[in-house]
Amino acid sequence: MMPRTIIEKIWDQHIVKHGEGKPDLLYIDLHLIHEVTSPQAFEGLRQKGRKVRRPQNTFATMDHNIPTVNRFEIKDEVAKRQVTALERNCEEFGVRLADLHSVDQGIVHVVGPELGLTLPGKTIVCGDSHTSTHGAFGALAFGIGTSEVEHVLSTQTLWQQRPKTLEVRVDGTLQKGVTAKDVILAVIGKYGVKFGTGYVIEYTGEVFRNMTMDERMTVCNMSIEAGARAGLIAPDEVTFEYCKNRKYTPKGEEFDKAVEEWKALRTDPGAVYDKSIVLDGNKISPMVTWGINPGMVLPVDSEVPAPESFSAEDDKKEAIRAYEYMGLTPHQKIEDIKVEHVFIGSCTNSRMTDLRQAADMIKGKKVADSVRAIVVPGSQSVKLQAEKEGLDQIFLEAGFEWRESGCSMCLSMNNDVVPEGERCASTSNRNFEGRQGKGARTHLVSPAMAAMAAIHGHFVDVRKFYQEKTVV
């Protein structure tokens, strides 16, 4: 057999029917659902008199539009109907549900891995674009639309066009203060928001190998912002150790057998990617987005670019539009940009590694008077673990708000929004116009960078923090 990439191996293992010159029919191992994109799909099943094909392969939670304060008091009528519909649909169709009373509740892309539902080699789908998060485990995971949600519910399969393969390799050693979020932002900043279109990315190199699973999930989460269908990292001992003893993982000899199978999930020597790019991890800095898409990003010690620095006319026009929306001027120093809000959370950066990084920055300090800062754990499990470690007290004593789990300020579908014209340092994944609220100005950063912005009221190079610690 010809050498294959891990992407090709997983794809080939899941083909139910090969489409000659057409999409392949893939078997789906895990279907994750939430309250926003599932109601219409269940209604479609009901109208056609169909059942959920594999309820045991389906898992639901509520996350997008639930409050993170007084979570049981949902005031928005649409949100309330969606949550109620999910409860009714899961009961009727026999689907497991982690509702607001469950210790398993949280953002769908956080709870899937921590419960052991997400495992190497699986095909995973969800009606949410950031399903690529699960690729951190060596799974092929991607978002789908509502009609596809219905198709998977009724057949446990999905027609998909075979993707091209793209290697993103980052070697070297990251500087102190440079995180997984900075790495993926640096990749997108260099190659743009469309370079991954039509591809599934495999992240390779020592920088990714040295990351925790939480950090790998951050990277794979933002594969979508690079335009890719999905992104993944081949499983290794770090992956296997994370998966061990999770609620839904195999146990004992079954787990050991699974690990032996998972070890084969790596790209063969001699396998050829359709495209490869390489970055030097030593040169990556803490990053801050300045514009209205994730590709408009620069090192924190940079200046907002001038229009003449863009060669393409469309890029110049987009930059001018960004200046106007973001309220910035060319040559303005990134570190001089003041913020009124700080959000630490989302499916990108709401796990224990993220909260520890942020807490490390603020211990013994106070949030600036001009800033409102909130921390939203990605799941009830993360919240409980953080409280066990005393992180909640560090945040509260510094002046942060400590919330219940949910998608929160990542998107303006719940009570947590940024007021019009105000600026937020956010650990989420999208800085589109209006993403955090009408007229809201979003700057994407790492948890460490967000925490420092909360303390100082403006962006600060977190590398200075580590330099000061070294001197002390």
From Swiss-Prot:
GO BP terms in the entry: L-leucine biosynthetic process
Does Thylakoid show up as a keyword for this record? Answer: no
Recorded GO terms, molecular function? 3-isopropylmalate dehydratase activity; 4 iron, 4 sulfur cluster binding; metal ion binding
Binding locations of [4Fe-4S] cluster: 347, 407, 410
Family in the record: Belongs to the aconitase/IPM isomerase family. LeuC type 1 subfamily.
This protein is called 3-isopropylmalate dehydratase large subunit
Superkingdom is Bacteria
Task: Tell me the function of this protein.
Answer: Catalyzes the isomerization between 2-isopropylmalate and 3-isopropylmalate, via the formation of 2-isopropylmaleate.
Output the PANTHER family linked to this UniProt entry.
3-ISOPROPYLMALATE DEHYDRATASE (PTHR43822:SF9), HOMOACONITASE, MITOCHONDRIAL-RELATED (PTHR43822)
Name the keywords, alphabetized. Answer: 4Fe-4S, Amino-acid biosynthesis, Branched-chain amino acid biosynthesis, Iron, Iron-sulfur, Leucine biosynthesis, Lyase, Metal-binding
Q: In which pathway does it act?
A: Amino-acid biosynthesis; L-leucine biosynthesis; L-leucine from 3-methyl-2-oxobutanoate: step 2/4
Assembly, per entry: Heterodimer of LeuC and LeuD.
Q: Does the keyword 4Fe-4S apply?
A: yes
- What cofactor is this protein dependent on? [4Fe-4S] cluster
What's the record's note on cofactor binding? Binds 1 [4Fe-4S] cluster per subunit.
Catalyses which reaction(s): (2R,3S)-3-isopropylmalate = (2S)-2-isopropylmalate
